[in-house]
Amino acid sequence: MERRKFLAGATAGAVGLGVPALTDDATVVPRQSPAFGRPGKDFPKVCGDLGNTNHSNLSRITRRNVGRLGGAWHVNLEGGSTAQHQQSTPVVRDGVLYVQTTQQNVFAVDGRNGAIKWKTSVGTRTTNLRGVALGDGKVFSTSGANIVYALDQETGAIVWQRQLITADEDDGNGGAGGTLAGAVVHFDGLIYVGMQGSTGGARGRAYALDASTGEVAWTFWAAPGPGEFGNDTWAGESWRTGGAVPWIHPAIDPELGLVYWTFSGPYPRTDGSSRAGDNLFANSIVALEAKTGKRRWHFQSVHHDIWDLDNVMAPVLSDVRVDRRTRQVVVYGSKVGMYYILDRRTGEAVHGMTEKPVPQDVRQKTAPTQPFPGGEPFVPQEPRLGKATRPVPFYETGGLYTPHWDRPVIIFPGAGGGGDWAQLSFNPHTGWIYVGYGLINSGFSNARGGRVNTSRPLGEYFAGGIAAVDPATNTPVWVKDGEWSLAHGNGILTTGGRVMFQGGPDGVLHAMDDVTGDVIWSFQTGAGVHTSPVSYEIDGEQYIAVLAGGNGLPYPDIPKGDHLWAFKLGGTVAPAPAPTPPSKRNDVRAAAVTGTTVTLGRVWNSSTGTPGTTENTVAQNAMSPQHLAVAVGTTVTFVNPADNGFAHAAVSFFEDEFDTGVLMPGDSHAHTFATPGTFFYNDAIFPQNTGKIVVF
């Protein structure tokens, strides 16, 4: 599918995918329900409100004056540490920001000047924390030890604590597996807490706890046990370690009394051979009664997932006009690059849903069909052969839902692509959903028999962008490809001033026009921004705040930090020095080795400084050495050892520097490097074997 872009310039006007030009006064959506608790001067919840709209109605910062935005204050929460990334989005009440760090510290920070009012430690090791909840005078936080804490909002003192994920919760082998994850949500005397661990065989569950005492009010098991609805979608005892974890926070409709929770993929994540069936409630959104945890309805977006396509992004609630009728919808998705827009009361697909036949592999027990919603995807659903993010050569490629077995198959958007877990924003002024997306290939194989999942092929390019999608039609209004993947926590905040904010892996926070998506202001924060900006007001002055600390995915070399920033009109705090941006390619991380020989099909023994003694056709690092550094003019010899059992061939890709041809065991090929550069190459026969040569 040809990439379609929305192009808007100073003189071009608003030209989109068949969408008329909009003005500042355009209002194309019904009045939204006030029951979600829309943010005013506060931003009291991660994603702003119970509907996860990530919209602030504050309007003093506008498209016309945003150029005057500057740093109001800046604080390094962890003393300037660059050792850890940060995924926590702040929440704000009465001029105070509350935020966690990966180092398991919870902070209360004065929103005027950045002064730390209190700090409470809830653990000693590092763990992903994505946001606290506020309610009943308390701050609720999870910890790496699977303890939920209630802290006094004024002092940070511990009010109560509750241990979760214990062996006595369940008689399944996965009952004690996993760790708490996702932002905490507070509503009507309960707090809602999720967990992660599907890649390790945890059995997913969602918790509701009494906010006053910490007692567990209910638990919803997402891999149902015997006698429970959905257990028959798991073969044998596979439900016991079935995964299906809720690692992102839910949305809540107070009027319907429903919690909308999304659940991850099943376990094993890329091998379906032992878990025949649809595997409910993996890859599903489930509407649960807020007070009891009773299932009201569910929708599964991927049956029997073997691609790590868990559409776990926090769902968004909105009211939209569809066929001249106001519909209360939940927007769900989407790594697969398309949204599932469902009726909040019934789960009905408001734009229709078609179960389409998909490619099959009997060994993987693949589902015969997969659901496709009415509308159009916001990213392509097949590899982009002519683009920078084209697949690494020699891999098999396929469209969405092409199965794999012993050899990797590249699909697109991959497990880190589409809209992964960046916070969406629903803008009541335009009526659109805004999403940051990734353009990333995945190349999974079945991990049995010593095979390894390549997941993201080495040497491939990462990219991404932002899209605006009209939920009334489930079609993109505009799509803007950019240089960075923006799918991993890079939340979008929209505001009443018609300005939206989003940060990127390079540390730059952008302000954009909410109609065109054009960048109208930028600021360097000092570390990758993989959280969502928030907005609040003190004494009539509007602030924007964000925590910049980086994230390990999809860029392992992203600049990390602990920078909490606030901005206001006329702010005078200068931007941070620009950090070294991450590599736009999935880089080889092995240390550089000097020499003039590369041995094919062998893993480098770093302790002896020699190639391994056995052939390896499945490992990504089966080039010895995997990272070679040579001077211009050096001749490098590529060798297929005589005791290897297979032919090999080393071919540089994207740069077209060398091609050894097929080398039988005992053969070699020499190539002289005449120009400096970085050259990735892989094996034309066993493509996951990948190396890098840097010529200086």
Question: Where are these predicted regions, by residue range?
Answer:
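N-terminal export signals
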Residues: 5-24
